[in-house]
Amino acid sequence: MEVVNALGRRKRAIARVFVSEGTGKITINKRDLAEYFPSTILQYVVKQPLNKLGAAEKYDIKVNLCGGGFTGQSQALRLAIARALIKMNAEDKAALRAEGFMTRDPRSVERKKPGQPKARRRFQFSKR
């Protein structure tokens, strides 16, 4: 039984995924998916690539998640799962790419600039 690993990132979140054949159990940092992500929306985001391929009950997934917030972590995990599924079966790549699961979202926080209170916000200007 082979174990396939993949990495996914989003904002400050990093997801390392280890996929093996099994019964559909997803374990995140030694906790169950429903325990780690109580929100059903985030659970749905994580399972999207599996549901698209109809592989929700085929694989056991172990995950190391660190950094970021809940939404960033769930999207990093979705990317990592999609990448791992392609390593398992390369023919699924077109279907996952069409749904946008293979694209790394490059948006992240813009840095704060000196002489300004935030990244884009300027200090209040006084004419007189």
Curated annotation (Swiss-Prot):
It comes from the Bacteria. HAMAP family: Ribosomal_uS9_B. GO terms for biological process: translation. Keywords: Ribonucleoprotein, Ribosomal protein. NCBIfam families: PRK00132.1. Residues 105-128 are annotated as: Disordered. Coiled coil: none annotated. Pfam families: Ribosomal_S9. It comes from Bacteroides thetaiotaomicron (strain ATCC 29148 / DSM 2079 / JCM 5827 / CCUG 10774 / NCTC 10582 / VPI-5482 / E50). Residues 114-128 have a biased composition (Basic residues). GO terms for cellular component: cytosolic small ribosomal subunit. GO terms for molecular function: RNA binding; structural constituent of ribosome. The gene is rpsI. This is Small ribosomal subunit protein uS9. Belongs to the universal ribosomal protein uS9 family.
